[in-house]
């Protein structure tokens, strides 16, 4: 990869965006940024708290500002986005115009397995989280596909294997 372009990871919660993103950034000697972590840092509060106080709409406004800022003002970063970031047309436009978008795909079964004990997932704090995951997938998967330059299935693969595959596929894009 001669020129360092921005790499944006999109996909559902539990797809491995943060874990794979860190691995990928390390392998490419690039900076890794997690948009959810930046939102929490700037707000001085957890995403759970933001959802409780401002609702999902308030959180999405914060997310839109942060994604615009991070994608506009940086070059050569690996950015892990929140699972719902693609709900915003502005975010989809910014991501697809300012870097290579990698859709990390995973099954609802694998998502459920990876997220069932995680209490920091406000959308899953419900009686039937699997049903919520299925509804979210139905709504969001077409949006991930719409902006993806590359789609990779992450079930049953280590972060290192997926990151290596991403590097190979990006090299083939250029």
Swiss-Prot record:
Its cofactor is Mg(2+). One of its GO terms (cellular component) is cytosol. It is found in: Cytoplasm. Mg(2+) binds at residue 18. Binds 1 Mg(2+) ion per subunit. Pathway: Metabolic intermediate biosynthesis; chorismate biosynthesis; chorismate from D-erythrose 4-phosphate and phosphoenolpyruvate: step 5/7. This is Shikimate kinase. It comes from Haemophilus ducreyi (strain 35000HP / ATCC 700724). The lineage of its organism: Bacteria, Pseudomonadati, Pseudomonadota, Gammaproteobacteria, Pasteurellales.
